[in-house]
Amino acid sequence: MYMLFENEDRSFIANLPIFFHDPAHQFLAIVLTLLGLLLGFSAAQNSLARIQLKQLALKLKNYSAWSLGENILNQAVEDEEIFKIKRVDRAILFFDIRGFTKWSEKESPENVVNMLNDYYIQAEVLTKDIPKLKVKYTADEIMVVFTNVDYAAKAAIIMRDHLNQYLEKYQLKIGGGIHLGPVVEGLIGSDKHKLFDVMGDTVNTAKRLCESAKGSEVLVSIEFIELTEGKAFTTECREVILKGKEKPFQVFPLTNYFAS
């Protein structure tokens, strides 16, 4: 463009050797070449930065989903109120592996971790289509939080049947417990370290029911039976002593469940 504006004589413009004989023209050519290289490099850097930013965003999303759970993460994007401490009604399901401690003492740490990871993966795959609020893994214990008791019961039946089949090769079994009622829910922790969790007597009772289950039983509370209105199939009611409870607690071994 500079050549066109400075020289209207086309024959002169066409004579490039003469044009570039001028030191000023040589300087301009060098500057324009360097400018083009700089712009090209800048565009490449911007493109690389965008790719790296997308990769970082994906990693952060995965890390957040691992910590919070994908369901909570998706809700938080729309409404951060989900993180606030609040009292809500939830159905809590616990499972743990019977004889896990004794079994793990005979195994290498690597074998124990590999077995647990496979166990967790199995549980996740089995319940992937069942809506749940939160899943928490603690050693051989699985806690799942549901907003709907039907989901909790359905997940319990599926997990009990299939995870016990998976654990047969280790000569292990799982037992579980379900209780429902009010919990305190939200982000719990210090300024720098927080965790989305649920707390309260409902959670403790579900855990105690799980601990009291025999073999591969899933024990449910009288509150569960009353709320589900005939959907649950159980064997005979019995009373157990739960840690922290003054009176015997009525429990029902859940055999099947039919949600409407």
Sequence positions of predicted segments:
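Juxtamembrane segments at transmembrane-helix boundaries
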Residues: M1-D9
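Alpha-helical scaffold within the catalytic cores of cyclic-nucleotide enzymes
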Residues: N114-K132, M143-G176, L180-G181, D201-K214, ...
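Catalytic NTP-binding/metal-coordinating core of nucleotidyl cyclase/transferase enzymes
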Residues: D79-K154
